[in-house]
Amino acid sequence: MLYAKALSIGDEIGFFSPSSPATAFAPNRFQRAKAYLKAQGFELVEGSLTGKSDYYRSGSIRERAEELNQLIRDPNVRCIMPTIGGNNSNSLLPYIDYEALRNDPKIIIGYSDVTALLLGIYAQTGLITFYGPALVASFGEYPPLVDETFHSFIDLLCSETNQYQYTMPSSWTDIKHDWETQHSAKPVYPNEWQFIGKGKVTGRIIGGNLNTMAGIWGSRYMPEIKVGDILLIEDSLKGIENVERSFAHLAACGVFERVSAIILGKHELFDNKGTGRTPLDVLIEVLADKNVPIFYGFDSCHTHPMLVTPLGVRGTIDFDNHTFKLEDRWVKAK
């Protein structure tokens, strides 16, 4: 197992665009996100494709891979964060300099389409990666939601402890605003976490964005889901028919027969097609008679605020006391 060093205020965070060109299509939100992290004391290092666009992506496959590799090889960069996800991060996997990352482990964080990179890097190097915020998508949000996301970022990445208990944010949102015309905080909903099961479950946390995992499934970049694992899954902007298909894919692959519990994150702007059903309802139907406990509504997903979750470390869900905590270290001493 490989661990990056914990972050310190003043460290350099490198950002890159592995898929969608957010720095080009959302310049106002991009500038706001940069200003926010700089105001918290971090230095930012721009990736080579900043401000560039090749229609649906920031650059060619090789250009995007080289942008990431430049940050991996920069000894001053201690954390690497995407600007946003998209659909094509998996294209980079054959070209990443894994050896450089083994020699100088860095914090690799992101979510959504970047799941392909998080899991691929973990599978190839053993480096603990982090399901967490992206620069433009997350830190371009307005307070108080962005502050809660940042507090989780600091709690997890600047800490050298080997235990952490998550606290449920009091509110959340998936309300969609035009990024370039948004000028204030979004309305929020009261929060709720649901614990469906009994007793305690401890296992390795693995997973990420459900749709993205399908793009690396069966490859050397997808870590084996082992007996006893805690599966983290979430998705965004999908219809109920696609969610059922994704869950059924996991079932067909025998995943639900191996995992000890499922963490199902909130689904941003879920389209239930008039059924009134939730992703939880769909999951329970697909599970059928499999008695897999579910922690539903965890805020490590596309909604705001976002909680940081290390992948590859041991966690414990207490279904009786409604708690979720980490039981392993996820970074090493500075």
From Swiss-Prot:
GO cellular component, one term: cytosol
Class of the enzyme per the UniProt entry, highest EC level: hydrolase
Gene Ontology biological process terms, A to Z: proteolysis
Residues forming the catalytic site: S112, E234, H302
GO MF annotations, alphabetized: carboxypeptidase activity; serine-type peptidase activity
Highest taxon, organism lineage: Bacteria
Signal peptide range: none
Keywords: Carboxypeptidase, Hydrolase, Protease, Serine protease
EC number(s) given by UniProt: 3.4.16.-
Family of the protein in this entry: Belongs to the peptidase S66 family.
The name this protein goes by in its record: Putative carboxypeptidase VC_A0337
Native source species: Vibrio cholerae serotype O1 (strain ATCC 39315 / El Tor Inaba N16961)
